[in-house]
Amino acid sequence: MKNRKRDTRWLVGVAMFVALQLVLQITGIGLIPLPLIKATTLHIPVILGAVVLGPLAGAILGGVFGICSIWTNTVAPSGLSFAFSPVLAAETAGAAGAVKAVWIAFGCRVMIGVVAGWLWIVLKKVKVNDLIALPVVGVAGAMTNTVLVMGSIYVLLRPEYAALKNVAMEAVLGLVMGVVGTSGVAEAIAAAILVTAVGKALLHVPAFRAKPQMG
């Protein structure tokens, strides 16, 4: 009976975070269009869900983030949308391009929740204070997103990225590092602040005090 009650709370918690992600997506503040990439706030619910519900929930929420990314980049494309939309990628690079886009848009986002969830478990096992652990997990989750996405673009789509930016292939690494050092750092700082503020409050909610689901 206890396990059933805990599982029900877990499912309700996951549904709550999914609903928050959908609100961010529908209102347009989940993925904010910039000239060549879309800045994101959708990683925040993924990280928070991973903290209070565990890595499995984090992976599910990361998958929802990925689906939102694919949808947005397909129906409202910007310069780099071919890297996040298997539909657009398939038009220019066939099935191989579609697979690459699925990994970048979906797979990398699943990893946000996995990394954040397991890092939180490790930090709590070694008894790190919440006020330290929460911002660390926030930064790690945000940087997992930025580094995996931009790193995958560099490894898998370097020629296409060079063509988009109208630069030589040798210049792509510098451009990728520029994105990581600007929008990536900004997203990490925002994640540290928001995950700490909201996460601290959520950890006082009785429903989130139970042992999180690990897989």
Regions from the PLM with identified roles:
Residues 1-215:
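Loop-helix junctions at membrane interfaces
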